[in-house]
């Protein structure tokens, strides 16, 4: 999923621009949106869903004849992005969250980081130019988004098994307590190398498709680092390739790790550390 955020002060035309982007992006793939609602409460007090939540339900799902609505106490941007990515959409358009690190299209004189383009008003937007900017953004993936992608592959009907690997940040090893890891990559080279590994592994007998995604930046203890998904005709062909994909990613892809522990921080290069 490629992400863009539209930011601006109130009444600057954010929703109008989001509408225009959604319409244009539909020509490129599936689209989902996220809206920052500030203090607005969707779960209206007194309704049955509100009563469920008030009684202590952590997640409430309401189903009507034309909608499915989920109410959750995990109300932060990362959870919203993961939820959107899990559906398998190709693009995520976010309205608001100007304090985030997301790539942004800014309306008016709003101050924010990572602004890729600034507009005076939505009707002055070159939509084609903005679409090209969005297409250049890195992919945001969850394990479920990769599973959704591999299930859409044209030859998936030949598959009898899908295997996955998820590497997470280990919090404790012997006497060492890790608080978080920090990953840096060699720009587009890392993605190119992962694509090369996937292409080569797909040539093996019985392998339908191979996908992998490695996160960068700061990742807290217990959080996901890397996902690998393999589809194969039979499990006997799947497991050796899944293991080879893990080992080759660790050995060949230019991604570097700094470990932040309770006793200090240091760079690590260890192919056995996932």
Stretches with model-predicted labels:
Residues 11, 22, 36-39, 65-66, ...:
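Short, ordered loop/turn segments at secondary-structure junctions
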Residues 15:
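Walker A/P-loop
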Residues 22-73, 83:
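N-terminal phosphate/diphosphate-binding loop that engages ATP/GTP or pyrophosphate donors
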Residues 100-135:
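Short phosphate-coordinating micro-motif centered on Lys-Gly-acidic
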